[in-house]
């Protein structure tokens, strides 16, 4: 399908720009898939299967806005200055803008909306202290709340230019501590229940 080709192309562009996060897009997409499958069978959160399939499909586009960030900022190993942090934060709104243009000719409003929301709002926080809009709780589109869990978890358990990888125990503890503040508490609880599958995913990826 045309949509699939576009998404694959976008993901490749982002990965080529930000190789310091090596494999982040593939890993977060796999995490989203695991959580989405959990949600498909959940009684606590009722979401349409077609919607969750769409979220899985658009997950690779969440960091598209990073193509507009200078390499010096994108790959900086140390702490950002205020100006650099502001530039880095701009990737979410920029990604949403680019996706809107790229998918303008694709006849799938649901996919476009989900892709824009995932890119724009995956750094929002449940308590309203995220960016770029400072949305809180259910003001944040659910697809972005799902993406936020995958994005942060992968950042925790992966080595970055500014940190070593955290172990599973520490990473899951940080996610648990963030329920109701950084993360949707219900989605977060279901995410924690996916721990066996998530650990298996990362162990298998490490072995490849």
Task: Give the label of every model feature segment.
Residues 4-208:
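Histidine- and acidic-residue-rich, metal-dependent catalytic cores
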């Amino acid at each position: 399908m045309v949509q699939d080709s576009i998404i694959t192309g976008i993901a490749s562009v982002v990965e080529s720009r930000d190789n310091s996060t090596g494999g982040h897009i593939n890993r977060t997409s796999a995490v989203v898939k695991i959580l989405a499958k959990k949600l498909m069978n959940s009684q606590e959160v009722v979401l349409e299967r077609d919607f969750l399939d769409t979220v899985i499909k658009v997950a690779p586009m969440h960091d598209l806005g990073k193509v507009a960030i200078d390499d010096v900022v994108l790959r900086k190993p140390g702490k950002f200055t205020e100006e650099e942090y502001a530039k880095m934060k701009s990737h979410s709104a920029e990604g949403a803008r680019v996706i809107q243009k790229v998918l303008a000719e694709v006849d799938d409003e649901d996919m476009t909306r989900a892709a824009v929301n995932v890119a724009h709002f995956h750094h929002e926080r449940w308590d309203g202290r995220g960016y770029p809009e400072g949305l809180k709780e259910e003001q944040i589109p659910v697809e972005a709340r799902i993406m936020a869990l995958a994005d942060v978890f992968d950042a925790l358990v992966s080595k970055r230019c500014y940190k070593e990888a955290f172990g599973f125990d520490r990473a899951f503890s940080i996610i648990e501590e963030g329920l109701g503040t950084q993360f949707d508490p219900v989605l977060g609880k279901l995410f924690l229940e996916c721990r066996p599958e998530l650990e298996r995913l990362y162990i298998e990826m490490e072995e490849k």
